[in-house]
Amino acid sequence: LPEEFDEKKKLIFYCKRGGNRSNSFHTVCGNIGWNCSVISGGYKSYRKFVIERTKKLSLSREFIIISGRTGNGKTRILNSLELNGLQVIDLEGLACHRGSILGGVIDTPQPTQKQFESNIFETLRKFQSNEIIFVESESRKIGRLTIPEHFFSSIYNSKLIKIENYSNHRVNFLIKEYSNFMEDHRAIFDLVNLLRKRISKENILDIEKYIADRDFKKLASELLSLHYDKSYDNSMFKRKGKLIKQFNFNCEVEDAVDYVCRYVIDNNIHKRETF
């Protein structure tokens, strides 16, 4: 125990309902001299608190969605905004998943659903109410995890910043972004199998040939045109949020990312009173 706990500032113990198990352990550790406490009502009480507070925070905060077809560097934009001190929730990061059929390439396994919800709450609670929170356009499912209902409802019809770029630039970006994955042919074949019900047999044969030939440009281009772009366009058709800015680029995605971030910061888009 000393090896695990000595460096901790404060220990918080809990069991399912906050009964004898956690209280007994708290007594022992307190007698040792550790600074510790018990969650009243146990984990069940904590879960109720997380759900209720997430709902309240979701309704009281204002969000802007960074939207755009796959390969526009939306996650890069969020990361850059966060590095510049803006409020960002990287849902894909919290879910340890890239939110697409290639999402499983991240080595870290996805958290449990309850841990994912706690991650969202812990991120939300630290934000200032007078500033916008930036999120990426997502479906409600990220891998095997589901975005909490009230949080998803709050962001679904939020204001939008839309990024457009030519497909050749998006293809180049995806090849660089997934460079390690592109070398793992077995993983590619496994994931492409998930598309068999969504695209034709002829297209699947073409994709398999591109993989075998290591023609990653054609592979990425085909995946965009056959699946990703259509999926994004369908999802955007259902959204009712106000479009506050659309960027139409014909440049490297990295340059577009820098431009969008600079625009947001220079124009104080992150301040709630701006709109």
PLM feature segments, named:
Residues 1-40:
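Catalytic cysteine-centered active loop of the rhodanese-like fold, especially the PTP/DSP P-loop
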Residues 34-48, 90-95:
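A short glycine-rich beta-strand->turn/loop micro-motif centered on a GG-aromatic cluster
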Residues 83-154:
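Conserved nucleotide-sensing/catalytic segment adjacent to the nucleotide-binding pocket
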